């Protein structure tokens, strides 16, 4: 994951999105549906209908960046809400991108000694 500047907000667009959209389509969706400015420096995350593909739109100060990730197995954990946005922390975004349930992360125990 590319390091985000301190103070960058991460917004998940709830529901599903037609991910055939590119820079222009997703920017328009941020403005009309989410009522946000796509050039604000915040990260906007969208999920496709099947749940195995997400796209992230981010203005880095020089231009718009569009990132995509498809899971080979499983689906991305997504909020149950059908409209609006959900805010994530950078740690939650990292878990989302790894396919981990970011809503209830579970720490695995590492053995201290192999006796």
What are these regions (language model features)?
Residues 1-115:
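Polybasic/polar functional segments that serve as interface/processing modules
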